[in-house]
């Protein structure tokens, strides 16, 4: 069973969101997603300054198995990307909820958070998929 940290919010497309304070949220893919994709070989991240709407595809995770779009879980402006992934994309596999974060976004619409799942809801969605 995949690790689903309680302090995070989730999407049904397997992204997670962590509030960093001041309207800034870190975004990554879940342990379940990285298990499905396998070993990461490249992460195509959005440009800092890009404005995204919730649901927009804004990054791509390329693994030995497939390339998968990553969707913005909330609307806002990309304020930082994880440059470590350029040389070490495997961080998404080894630490998806820590060093393997993808980008940080300044939220523009707090109501987007209402659309996200809590850990229990995300775990239930995984069990439905099995």
Curated annotation (Swiss-Prot):
<feature type="modified residue" description="N6-lipoyllysine">
    <location>
        <position position="65"/>
    </location>
</feature>
<comment type="function">
    <text>The glycine cleavage system catalyzes the degradation of glycine. The H protein shuttles the methylamine group of glycine from the P protein to the T protein.</text>
</comment>
<dbReference type="GO" id="GO:0019464">
    <property type="term" value="P:glycine decarboxylation via glycine cleavage system"/>
</dbReference>
<keyword id="KW-0450">Lipoyl</keyword>
<comment type="similarity">
    <text>Belongs to the GcvH family.</text>
</comment>
<dbReference type="InterPro" id="IPR017453">
    <property type="entry name" value="GCV_H_sub"/>
</dbReference>
<dbReference type="InterPro" id="IPR033753">
    <property type="entry name" value="GCV_H/Fam206"/>
</dbReference>
<dbReference type="InterPro" id="IPR002930">
    <property type="entry name" value="GCV_H"/>
</dbReference>
<comment type="subunit">
    <text>The glycine cleavage system is composed of four proteins: P, T, L and H.</text>
</comment>
<protein>
    <recommendedName>
        <fullName>Glycine cleavage system H protein</fullName>
    </recommendedName>
</protein>
<dbReference type="GO" id="GO:0005829">
    <property type="term" value="C:cytosol"/>
</dbReference>
<dbReference type="GO" id="GO:0005960">
    <property type="term" value="C:glycine cleavage complex"/>
</dbReference>
<feature type="domain" description="Lipoyl-binding">
    <location>
        <begin position="24"/>
        <end position="106"/>
    </location>
</feature>
<dbReference type="InterPro" id="IPR003016">
    <property type="entry name" value="2-oxoA_DH_lipoyl-BS"/>
</dbReference>
<dbReference type="Pfam" id="PF01597">
    <property type="entry name" value="GCV_H"/>
</dbReference>
<dbReference type="InterPro" id="IPR011053">
    <property type="entry name" value="Single_hybrid_motif"/>
</dbReference>
<dbReference type="InterPro" id="IPR000089">
    <property type="entry name" value="Biotin_lipoyl"/>
</dbReference>
């Amino acid at each position: 069973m995949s690790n689903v940290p309680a302090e995070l919010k989730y999407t049904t497309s397997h992204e997670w969101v962590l509030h960093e304070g001041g309207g800034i949220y870190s975004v990554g893919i879940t342990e379940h997603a990285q298990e499905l994709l396998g070993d990461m070989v490249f992460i195509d991240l959005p440009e800092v300054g890009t404005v995204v709407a919730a649901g927009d595809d804004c990054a791509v995770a390329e693994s030995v198995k497939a390339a998968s779009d990553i969707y913005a879980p909330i609307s806002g402006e990309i304020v930082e990307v994880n440059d470590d992934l350029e040389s070490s994309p495997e961080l998404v596999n080894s630490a998806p909820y820590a060093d393997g974060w993808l980008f940080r976004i300044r939220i523009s619409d707090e109501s987007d958070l209402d659309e996200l799942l809590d850990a229990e809801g995300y775990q239930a969605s995984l069990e439905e998929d099995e």
